[in-house]
Amino acid sequence: MLAFESTSTRNKDSLIRRKSTQGSFLSLILLISFVQVAKGDDSYDERKKQAIELYRQGKYMDALPILEKLHAENPKDAQVLEGMSFGTLAHAATLSDPAARREERIKARKLAVEAQAAGNNSNMVKTLLELPEDGSEPSFSNSPEVEAAMREGEAAFAKGDSESAVAAYNRALVLDPKQYSAALFLGDVSFKKGEHAQAGEWFLKAIQIDPNRETAYRYWGDDLVAQGRLSEAKEQFIKAVVAEPYRRITWMGLSQWAQKQKMVLKSPAINPPGKIEDKGKDEKGHSQTNITIDMSMLNSKDKKDGTDCWFVYTLSKAVWHGERFQKEFPNEKEYRHSLAEEMDGFQMVVSQVKEKLKKKEIKQLDPALASLVKISDEGLLESFIVISRPDEGIIKDYPAYRDLHRDKIVQYISEWILQSAQ
């Protein structure tokens, strides 16, 4: 449960945590590791089994030396490399010296790089690769007392001492009732002990502290999966995505849930043709833009499938690169792509499609346009944009939209992103 800083978020989430009920280093080893080890090497296999069992029990420090010996014998074992990376990160949490912790975190990431090079692209390896290359770590709190309590809890957890970890996390929460990670980690420990009701209470507590952090939802989803409460688990995994959709790790829980339900996560195939490029300003300060028109849009009138309506989407963007953006965002000095701009363009397309349908000028509506119209009619157009078509500019508009329309984002993910794999 080691704190780390993802490159894409400020959240102080933890990496050293329970084995996932949805898929992990352990399950990967159990499924495929022995295929990769030379047949007849019982000693290697048995020691690998032992390391797995210790890991299952949360005894990371006991598993690490075994993994190190296995690595010395077979440096290319991708699963052993993953286990060593995870174990090394756990060991870092037990160290009181910040410089020593940094060195171990650097080592942990390097081992993850080696694991990936050896062919291991598991979710855990991808997560370990998000560790900062310089080994830096965020603090849990500006309060020295809270920080010390959290570090103590992390060290105890990494050593498999859950009782001491609980005591330290509780102390941190008493000192700071808004300490998200303390509530989160208390739920995590409860989950490991099979205390599901208590785990749920702690995860809910963390969510109440900060509903815009994804981890408590995702951990709670894992806990519900372990209980066989799959429908409720899906709800939590979706809420995790709503909280922080632009982190790779956020989608992990929902993706694994979907896979087990023979479903996939896939955005609607709606890709407007044409493009517009912002070329800055000329000598007089006037905006310069290049509009690229996909000529197939103009020729599509003969198809009578409505695809010529995409023409207005491209044209709508030209005004946004000029005065329209300044009018809508008077406090922003430089142009950026925005949710409002995308909404304007898509709504113009939808309006034109509906007008043509009314006039019976469309014989067979293009599937992408049919989906766009349906999404618009369901009031999910903005959710489609922020989830399926985000960029740096649109991401800036997400918090305000999320705070007002969580239900719409949940609906969009449930009805449009989760699709049957058949």
For each of these PLM feature ranges, what is it?
Residues 238, 252-422:
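Eukaryotic alpha-helical solenoid repeat scaffolds
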Residues 90-101, 131-146, 257-283:
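Alpha-helical linker/edge segments of TPR/alpha-solenoid repeat scaffolds
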Residues 44, 78-79, 123, 146, ...:
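Helix-start (N-cap) detector for alpha-helical repeat units in TPR-like alpha-solenoids
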Residues 83-84, 127-128, 151, 185, ...:
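Canonical tetratricopeptide repeat
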